[in-house]
Amino acid sequence: MRKGDEKRQEMLAVAERLFCLKGYEATSVQDILNVLHASKGGFYHHFASKEALLDTLLYQRAARALEQTELALAEETRDMPRLNRVMYGFMPLRREEADFAAMLLPMLDKPEGRALRLSYQQALVETFLPVMEREMAQAQDAQVICPPAEDMAEVLLDLLSQCWIDLALLLLSGVKKAQRPDAAALLTMLEKYRRTVERLLDAPFGSVEIITLGEWNEVAEELSRRLLLPMQG
């Protein structure tokens, strides 16, 4: 790796750590530079703004999620579970993503949150689309799902994007009222999307699993706890 690329990766690593520790909005470019003992000129050589740096992080997280998904797929031979693994890997509200999700959630319902949601959706869809197309084709060949319409993989990923965003906003609405997560409402919403995906694919009843209920309960509780801490302080 070239020296310039190393410095860029170092900036990304430090920024991600600070964003997760202090929050994105509470972290300034200068905070990042102070850790790196770098100049503003050095920062702006690599990134046009803090927002541009965050966009790069979103693509990095998506690429990392895909790597983890491919590792999981290497150990799974059954077609429907493979599709489930891709859907699970696509979702940012997984146990492994709790730190990053807790950093993003407070911004989602703000005016700038729409741009953030669109940026993350674009990063995830672009990254996961080839593997989703591949796995859907294999499942179709195995007659696990019915022949999907053209561009159905992208439609499915857009649906999953709306799923995690709606879950996050519902969780956030409870936090703003200083309430613990409404487990029943969250599970109802997750089940609504699960059934929609199942119908979209014409998959066997009960075969689609976006994320296990146990893990989602755990993640929702953890995200709620982290988001409530600043309000209690």
What are these language model-derived features?
Residues 126, 130, 134-137, 141, ...:
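C-terminal peripheral helix-coil segments that are non-catalytic and often amphipathic
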Residues 58, 62, 117-129, 157, ...:
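Amphipathic, non-transmembrane alpha-helical scaffold segments
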Residues 56, 67-102, 149-156, 190:
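Hydrophobic alpha-helical connector segments
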Residues 7-15, 32, 57-61, 65, ...:
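Generic hydrophobic, amphipathic alpha-helix propensity
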Residues 72, 76, 104-108, 167-178:
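Secondary-structure edge/capping motif, primarily at the C-terminal ends of alpha-helices
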Residues 96-154, 178-180:
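Short secondary-structure transition hinges
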Residues 10, 18-57:
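Helix-turn-helix
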